[in-house]
Amino acid sequence: MLRSAAITKGTQRSPNRAMLRAVGFGDEDFNKPIIGIANGYSTITPCNIGLNDLARRSEEAARQAGAMPQMFGTITVSDGISMGTEGMKYSLVSREVIADSIETACNAQSMDGVLAIGGCDKNMPGAMIALARMNIPGVFVYGGTIKPGKLADRDLTVVSAFEAVGQHASGKINEEQLTAIEKNACPGAGSCGGMFTANTMSAAIETLGLSLPYSSTMAAEDEEKANSAARSAEVLVDAIKANICPRDLLTKNAFENAISVVMAVGGSTNAVLHLLAIARSAGVDLCIDDFERIRQRVPVICDLKPSGRYVTVDLHNAGGIPQVMKQLLDAGLLHGDCRNVEGKTLRELLKDVPSEPSAEQDVIHPLSKPVYAKGHLAILKGNLASEGCVAKISGIKTPVLTGPARVFESEEACLAAILNNKVKAGDVVVIRNEGPVGGPGMREMLAPTSAIVGEDLGDKVALITDGRFSGGTYGLVVGHVAPEAAVGGMIGLVQEGDSITIDANQLLIQLNVEKDELERRSSAWEKTQPRYQTGVLGKYARMVSSASNGAVTDQP
């Protein structure tokens, strides 16, 4: 029996049916599955501006497949627009709001399945958390990647504009050049074009089996994206008939596959946070140490921005995520028996994919000639992060640095210092009180890291924070430091000039201060009043867990 029978069957449900008749149901429709279409459409960001078209295609395909689609909206926050402002504190919060809204709408109306459509960074994990919680048949449709901007012969992304700010501040480019980059960086609809957070999470979801093969790298404005959205609705109707539910697919092995693909494509640090949160909602025992274990055996084989040369449409043209997965599967680095929402195993899905990438491209490297021999997202531990932290070590020349701490209590203070040439080669920049509780909201530090790169300090300065990093960040950056400063973590005890060692080879992050002195500082530490005590941010700060657990708000 369909779950929606709770609102469509029996004489007692006559009032319920009366309401449904008002929105277009006829007598025969009460026997059809009701599908929710969670539409993240918004004109605030290019990531989501094209979602209405995909929603309409999905809606029509669902009707043709014998279902009754019911569309409802969910929110988005544009990370690129809110970046570097107080508004960025709402970004990670929006992941929880999206998850809660989808769960609420679907369960309140007893929907039989849900097709979630999203574009910007938090849309993907928010939808996946909801699907995992509800465990009703579901499919995710990614809005698609933006195509690269062009300036002369150079491919641009929005990160090019962030880096140009640092280049302008250091005198490397003039205002006219800065404006030219600004005007050409984002040419149309779609999510930020490199292997940044949105494209990383779409790749992870395709690997997990809750979106269709090849769909995670399609360009937003191409017809194949709209066709894929329509096909996704058909697949969802079949999944309802076959009772294929998210938790059937979201196994520990599936998460290990997703982590392997994130490493192989050189994905965002945010994947650690989001996959931990999705796994928790699915009841899967995934921990931060699993990422390090997998990193040690999976190389980076895609040469993608931010640290590489190419963008996601180039990856799609080179064979997409299936081509990446086929190499990993053949090498024994993936679990081939994991299934997708179509009910097919990974091994079945990849049987016709070439074992080696085409020699006519160099976006996807063969395993024998990787971009990096090991994964790029290292989990460091030490007295500065006893619960762990995430270091992105791709594109850096020196994975070991010991230097003096430059301590900042906010992103804004740090950015001002960088742009005023007060951060020098060899410094270890510490931005604290930006964690899940302390921020609150764990802002991304793209503006400071881009300014560092723009001033040609990317391989000479390290940055440590209890906040996050954008998927567009590269260099020696260490985020998600836990415990965070606001709850008494060691990062809150660092003083200006203290010696800090980051050693990616030894997986170590250490504050080089005598134990007695650290104990003295700890005893003198006092918890500060929350920056927000009411509203969404106040509520979030009271509820959110540590970054090492995914920064979730529904912990038991």
Curated annotation (Swiss-Prot):
The gene is ilvD. One of its GO terms (molecular function) is 2 iron, 2 sulfur cluster binding. Pathway: Amino-acid biosynthesis; L-isoleucine biosynthesis; L-isoleucine from 2-oxobutanoate: step 3/4; Amino-acid biosynthesis; L-valine biosynthesis; L-valine from pyruvate: step 3/4. This is Dihydroxy-acid dehydratase. It comes from Prochlorococcus marinus (strain MIT 9313). It catalyses: (2R)-2,3-dihydroxy-3-methylbutanoate = 3-methyl-2-oxobutanoate + H2O; (2R,3R)-2,3-dihydroxy-3-methylpentanoate = (S)-3-methyl-2-oxopentanoate + H2O. The lineage of its organism: Bacteria, Bacillati, Cyanobacteriota, Cyanophyceae, Synechococcales. Pfam families: ILV_EDD_C (PF24877), ILVD_EDD_N (PF00920). GO terms for biological process: isoleucine biosynthetic process; L-valine biosynthetic process. Belongs to the IlvD/Edd family. Keywords: 2Fe-2S, Amino-acid biosynthesis, Branched-chain amino acid biosynthesis, Iron, Iron-sulfur, Lyase, Magnesium, Metal-binding. Its cofactor is [2Fe-2S] cluster; Mg(2+). Binds 1 [2Fe-2S] cluster per subunit. This cluster acts as a Lewis acid cofactor. The modification N6-carboxylysine is found at K122. Mg(2+) binds at D79, D121, K122, E444.
